[in-house]
A protein has these predicted regions:
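Conserved beta-strand elements of beta-rich interaction domains across eukaryotes
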Residues: 16-19, 47, 52-55, 73-77
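Conserved, well-structured core segments
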Residues: 10-13, 45-48, 56, 68
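A short acidic (Asp/Glu
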Residues: 23, 58-59
Length: 138
């Protein structure tokens, strides 16, 4: 049962400076209207990494870099191997909270390989994230 799995990971979410005040006020929101979005290769979700160099790519060109260190409820993740390609694993349209729950999963874990250097951790419900620390690097 996915509801009983309390598996969490302490992960990194990189964001652009203009987004930080909205995040502090409202938390991370999937597809906010007022934010700069950096892509959705694995569907519309909240993306994290265990690697700062991966998250650094989402901080933009400002000299200051902002990382959120978050407790992320991964529960029982579905596993996807490498870069997204049509016909491989679940489809992008299935990469959402309701579909993953229907097949017994809470999140998506993308394993490195097939050209992907770093793993990615994606949740599709904003209540699965909780900011523990904010790292602001100058």
């Amino acid at each position: 049962d996915t509801q009983t799995s309390q598996h969490t990971e302490l992960l990194i979410h990189g964001t652009r400076n203009p987004n930080i005040f909205s995040i502090l006020k409202c938390g991370l929101i999937i597809r906010p209207t007022n934010a700069v979005i950096s892509g959705a290769a694995y569907g519309e979700g909240i993306y994290h990494s265990a690697h700062t160099d991966k998250s650094l790519g989402y901080t933009g060109y400002d000299p200051d870099k902002i990382f959120l260190i978050q407790n992320v409820h991964m529960g029982i993740p579905d596993v996807y191997n490498g870069w997204y390609r049509d016909g491989k694993g679940i489809s992008r349209q299935q990469m959402n909270y309701n579909h993953l729950k229907s097949i017994g999963h809470d999140s998506l874990y993308v394993k490195p390989g097939d050209g992907l250097r770093n793993s990615e951790y994606i949740v599709y419900n904003q209540q699965q994230t909780n900011t523990e620390y904010i790292l602001w690097m100058k």
